[in-house]
């Protein structure tokens, strides 16, 4: 596969350029480089040479996928986890020894729920040297402002933190709120939440989402934001056509040595050098 640092085509107007001379090409590359620096675009793109790629799993899995449409995640160099109280007491030193290099930790839900393991998980992840941040599970029966204030109240600013995360997905099993607002309302509330988080922490949050939620609400929107996508059987380029992404949650049934039970495992979209560059630009 070939990895390319790129900015969405909209950054330079979507025009197709053609040049006949090396001089013109050199001038264009210089201009384009300057435009990329100005725009601040940090998306990653990819190319797969085959439509179905298998491969040996990097980690164990209690329900493994043996053939991935569009490309497998296992050969990616940078893997991470996301956790909540449901994983119980975690041994973060063991997680680090498994080669895990980033973590997203559940902090809050709605406007009044705090994950009881958040403080310990975020402390222990950071102590183990794993770049990490907190995520908020959005609740559609509470205003975005109230939810952002609740998150800010419970998640301190932490030097060296990854950007915080806004988890956007439908919750059909919720005992208290199964509301599904119109897509325009969803996006409006998301923007309110994200702006409040940006003002407080200095970074716009990463957007985590699922296939159905993205299709119904986010397709074609938030083009300059960082996306973390769930896709457990196919590559995101198949499941989320046209969406640039940075993180991919590829299993909810991963297994790590010396860590009890199933755990969500994710990959970063690019190479190790791209990871280093992304960290430098993203960490505050």
Language-model segments: which ranges?
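Intrinsic-disorder-associated, low-complexity terminal segments enriched in Asp/Asn/His/Tyr and depleted
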Residues: 5-6, 20, 24
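Sec-dependent N-terminal signal peptides
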Residues: 24-33
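C-terminal motif of bacterial Sec signal peptides marking the signal peptidase cleavage site
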Residues: 38-40
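Catalytic domains of cell-wall/extracellular-matrix polysaccharide-remodeling enzymes
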Residues: 163-241
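Substrate-binding cleft of extracellular glycoside hydrolase catalytic domains
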Residues: 73, 77-89, 106-191, 198-200
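Functionally critical loop-and-helix segments that line ligand-binding/catalytic clefts
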Residues: 45-80, 222-284
């Amino acid at each position: 596969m070939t990895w390319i640092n790129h900015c969405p085509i909209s950054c330079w107007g979507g025009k197709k350029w053609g040049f006949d001379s090396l001089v013109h090409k050199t001038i264009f590359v210089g201009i384009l480089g300057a435009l990329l620096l100005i725009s601040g675009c940090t998306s990653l793109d990819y190319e797969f040479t085959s439509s179905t790629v298998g491969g040996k799993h990097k980690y164990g899995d209690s329900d493994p996928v043996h053939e991935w449409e569009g490309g497998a995640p296992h050969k990616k160099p940078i893997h991470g986890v996301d956790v909540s109280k449901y994983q119980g007491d975690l041994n973060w030193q063991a997680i680090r020894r498994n080669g895990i290099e980033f973590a997203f930790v559940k902090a809050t839900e709605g406007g009044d729920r705090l994950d009881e393991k958040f403080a310990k998980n975020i402390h222990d992840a950071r102590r183990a040297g794993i770049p990490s941040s907190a995520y908020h599970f959005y609740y559609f029966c509470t205003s975005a402002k109230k939810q952002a204030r609740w998150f800010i109240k419970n998640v301190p600013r932490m030097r060296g933190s990854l950007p915080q995360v806004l988890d956007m997905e439908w919750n059909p099993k919720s005992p208290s709120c199964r509301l599904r607002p119109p897509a325009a309302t969803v996006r409006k509330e998301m923007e309110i939440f994200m702006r409040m988080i940006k003002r407080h922490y200095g970074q716009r949050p990463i957007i985590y989402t699922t296939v159905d939620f993205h299709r119904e609400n986010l397709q074609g929107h938030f083009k300059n934001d960082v996306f973390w996508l769930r896709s457990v059987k196919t590559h995101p380029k198949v499941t989320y056509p046209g969406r640039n992404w940075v993180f991919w949650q590829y299993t909810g049934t991963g297994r790590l040595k010396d860590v009890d039970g199933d755990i969500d495992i994710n990959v970063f979209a690019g190479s190790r050098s791209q990871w280093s560059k992304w960290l430098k630009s993203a960490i505050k």
